[in-house]
């Protein structure tokens, strides 16, 4: 059996053990095109042979930029890695300036794009990147070479021996990829991950995912340029799981069709799913509506392992049969695991989705740790709501004196590319300093409390952890995004982006004329209603932590407008700059 020590070993292992008819599947113009394990390997080898003919050498960097997950990305990935070259995945939504920076910083020699939209962005800065020899597109794009030309160039197998020799020369500790973190401040940093980093993380994370080997389907929609989904793609290959790719804005339609057993999620997505479900429940009438909200209330009290007693479990069984089964059917009916990561998951969502048997398991990790550090697992008592589970095997988690979480293990990055100073700041005595604050309970479960860098002191000298407040405020259906402010000021306050759709619906029911978004955010009744939500959230916090004032913003906070990173994290500095007038109003700065 193929021993897995390098990333390109995964498909060969899958071929020996499972030889799937459907290893990868992508929908093109309403038709599913499936790729077997054998085809996957054959095409990856064709890419390797072609890249050699195009002059690609060991340690060259090949950039891949795709608007959505698709089969071609994975074929390219293996084709590049087999040569000892590195795959540099780039978020499609970043600005042209960042494209130029990453392509130059990595010295990318070729760039593969998914479609015309991405091609136009690359084309606009191509002359600023002297190392870039050519650009190829997966879709047919006018005046752009197509990746099918590369596949055709690789049809001649006479240089396959050269590919095999290069493959054999790749060591587990060699650099596999540069992943540029979507920094909340400053330029992106290139995280250097080795084959061993990602292989170990996939193999250790696999132990936490209850999945039927060789006979299950996954739905992949989180960006594969992010290390979280990328590592899981390797894990799925190891499990013999068929991977179906879906656009992120059509998850429910694809899930109904594919009927996946496993998928990944981020809290923001789960929040939106929950809000949609509640909105549908609100539209019900009579007994149906009563039953629906009875089930939701029951779900919000959920504790695993029958901790609520037999009477609760009996009611839960009934709720699952009458209500929650319909929720499951909306995502295909087979879903048993949803791994949630990238940001803090509200405990109420963990409760209600697990009551509904979605198997939402929260984990914790960073790009620099390939990414998984810890994850919950329903089996063997390994699940505790409000925590990110226990550390995976071979991983040591240490809490520093100031509460910072420090990690040692085979998944810790090699360092930041071309940046020994920043590397030295975070890698100290073999431990990676995460910048997150947390604690480990008596049973070994890790709990994250805040970002070290995001905590601030008020002018009264009191520490405030903004994420805790933000997560509580976002439980309100009136609030879509929020940023807690107050560093060196007399009190904490908040900049709030209301949930415009929900508020307009609420206003209609209450016969309130709210007008445009600009008018809505200054409407007395809207402000008064959101003030009630803020007051309710404040009840959970100490006097000095409470949000004492807020302002509503008229724009929807987005990645494109610069409010958020591609992983939906707040760019605090930019949000503050955008709404400096509102900030100054709150604190009465002239």
Residue ranges and their predicted role:
Residues 391-458, 475:
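Conserved ATP-binding/catalytic segment of the ANL
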Residues 82-153, 529:
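Structural core segment of the AMP-binding/adenylate-forming
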Residues 24-55, 60-71, 76-78, 95-100, ...:
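Conserved AMP-binding/adenylate-forming core of the ANL superfamily
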Residues 199-220, 224-324, 334:
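Conserved AMP-binding/adenylation subdomain of ANL enzymes
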Residues 456, 481-484, 531-590:
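Conserved C-terminal "lid"/linker of ANL adenylate-forming enzymes
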Residues 20-22, 137, 155-180, 187, ...:
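Conserved pre-ATP/AMP-binding loop-to-beta segment of ANL
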Residues 34-38, 176-202:
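Conserved AMP-binding A3 loop
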Residues 314, 381, 385, 412-435, ...:
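Conserved ANL (AMP-binding/adenylate-forming) active-site segment centered on the GW(Y/F)…HTG consensus within
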């Amino acid at each position: 059996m193929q021993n897995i020590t390098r990333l390109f070993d995964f498909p060969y292992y899958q071929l020996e053990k499972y030889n799937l008819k459907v290893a990868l599947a992508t929908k093109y113009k309403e038709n599913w095109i499936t790729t077997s394990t054998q085809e996957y390997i054959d095409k990856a080898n064709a890419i390797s042979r072609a890249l050699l003919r195009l002059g690609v050498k060991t340690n060259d960097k090949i950039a891949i930029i795709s608007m959505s997950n698709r089969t071609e990305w994975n074929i390219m990935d293996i084709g590049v890695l087999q040569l000892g070259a590195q795959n540099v995945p780039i978020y499609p939504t970043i600005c042209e300036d960042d494209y130029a920076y990453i392509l130059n910083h990595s010295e990318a020699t070729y760039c593969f794009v998914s479609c015309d939209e991405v091609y136009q962005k690359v084309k606009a800065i191509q002359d600023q990147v002297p190392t870039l020899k050519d650009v190829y597109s997966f879709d047919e794009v006018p005046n752009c070479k197509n990746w099918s030309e590369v596949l055709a160039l690789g049809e001649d197998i006479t240089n396959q021996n050269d590919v095999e020799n290069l493959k054999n020369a790749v060591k587990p500790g060699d650099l596999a990829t540069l992943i540029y973190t979507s920094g909340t401040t400053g330029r992106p940093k290139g995280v250097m991950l080795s084959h061993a980093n990602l292989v170990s993380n996939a193999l250790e994370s696999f132990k936490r995912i209850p999945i039927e080997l060789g006979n299950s389907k996954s739905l992949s929609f989180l960006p594969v340029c992010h290390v979280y989904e990328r590592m899981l793609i390797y894990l799925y290959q190891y499990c013999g799981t068929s991977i179906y790719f879906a656009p992120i804005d059509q998850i429910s339609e694809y899930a109904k069709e594919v009927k996946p057993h496993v998928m990944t999620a981020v809290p923001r997505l789960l929040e939106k799913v929950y809000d949609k479900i509640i909105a549908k429940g609100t539209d019900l009438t009579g007994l149906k509506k009563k039953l629906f909200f009875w089930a939701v209330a029951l779900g919000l009290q959920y504790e695993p392992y029958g901790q609520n007693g037999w009477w609760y479990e009996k009611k839960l069984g009934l709720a699952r049969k009458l209500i929650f089964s319909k929720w499951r059917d909306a995502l295909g009916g087979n879903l048993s695991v949803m791994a949630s990561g990238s940001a803090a998951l509200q405990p109420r969502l963990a409760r209600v989705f697990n009551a509904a048997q979605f198997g939402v398991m929260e984990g914790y990790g960073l790009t620099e740790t390939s990414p998984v550090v810890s994850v919950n697992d329903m089996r063997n008592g390994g699940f505790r709501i409000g925590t990110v589970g226990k550390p995976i095997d071979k991983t040591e988690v240490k809490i520093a004196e100031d509460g910072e979480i420090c990690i040692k293990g085979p998944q810790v990055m090699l360092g930041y590319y071309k940046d020994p100073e920043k590397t030295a700041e975070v890698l100290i005595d073999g431990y990676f300093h995460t910048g997150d604050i947390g604690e480990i309970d008596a049973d070994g479960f890790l709990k994250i409390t805040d970002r070290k860098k995001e905590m601030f002191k008020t002018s009264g000298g009191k520490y405030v952890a903004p994420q805790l407040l933000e997560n509580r405020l976002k439980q309100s259906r009136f609030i879509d995004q929020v940023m807690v402010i107050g560093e060196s000021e007399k009190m904490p306050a908040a900049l709030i982006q209301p949930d415009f759709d929900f508020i307009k619906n609420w206003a209609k029911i209450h016969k309130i004329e709210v007008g445009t978004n600009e008018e809505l955010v200054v409407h007395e009744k809207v402000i008064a209603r959101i003030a009630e939500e803020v007051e309710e959230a404040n009840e959970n916090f100490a006097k000095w932590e409470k949000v004492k004032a807020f302002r509503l913003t008229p724009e929807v906070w987005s990645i494109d407008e610069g409010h958020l990173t591609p992983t939906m994290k707040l760019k605090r500095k930019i949000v503050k700059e955008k709404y400096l007038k509102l900030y100054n109003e709150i604190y009465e700065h002239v």
